[in-house]
Amino acid sequence: MVREGMYEVYMPLIAEGEITNLIVKSEKGTLGRKIFADLSSIARGKLGNLIGKITEIKDDKVIAEPLGITLYASYIQRFVRRGTTKIDDSFVCESADKRKLRVKPVMITRKIVKRSVHSALVRETRDFLEKSFAEAKMNDIFLETLHGEMQRKLSKKLKRVYPLSFCEIRELLVEK
C-alpha cells in the first residue's frame, strides 16, 4: 500500500537522479499515468519535455519508462532566419527490440534550397535514422537523442548533401 504524499520520479534508463516530483494519492490512480518532465535539468539547456509512463512504485520512489521527447517550438524558432529553409519530416521506425517509434526530425539550412536538395535531405535523414534505429534498442535511442549524439551523427552525414545550421529531432514518441 502506498501512502499519500510527494514522491520523487525516477527514469533509470534515461537519467541518473530524479527527474521530477509527483503528488500521489493512491497507487491505483498513479500506475499507468503519464508524466511530463522538463529537460533543462537533464539535457543541455531549456529545450523541451520528457514524457514518461509510471510503471511501478517501490521504496518511496516512483519508477517511469520513457514514452517520448518533444522540443519546444520556441527553441526551434530561435534558429529560423529569413533566407533559410526549414525542413520537417515525420515517419515511423522500428527499433531492434521491435518497438515502433515516431520520429520528427527538423533541419534548417543556411540558405534557401531547391526542391531537389530538400528531397535529398529528407531521403538521407530517413535512411540514416531507420538504419540507426534498427540497430539499437529503444532505451539506447532515447539516451542518444537526449544527449545529442544521434543528432551529431545525422548532421555530419547531412553535411555532405547541403550545409545545415541546425539539425535536431523535434519529437521522438513511442507508437502504440
Where are the predicted features?
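Hydrophobic-cavity lipid-handling domains and compact docking modules
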Residues: 1-113
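Extended, low-charge, aliphatic-rich alpha-helical segments
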Residues: 153-176
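Short acidic, glycine/tyrosine-flanked loop/strand segments centered on an H-E-D-like triad
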Residues: 94-141
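A generic hydrophobic-segment detector
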Residues: 129-132, 150, 158
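Surface-exposed loop/turn and secondary-structure junction residues enriched for glycine/proline
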Residues: 79, 83, 144-145, 175
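Acidic, low-complexity glycine/serine/threonine-rich segments
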Residues: 136-153
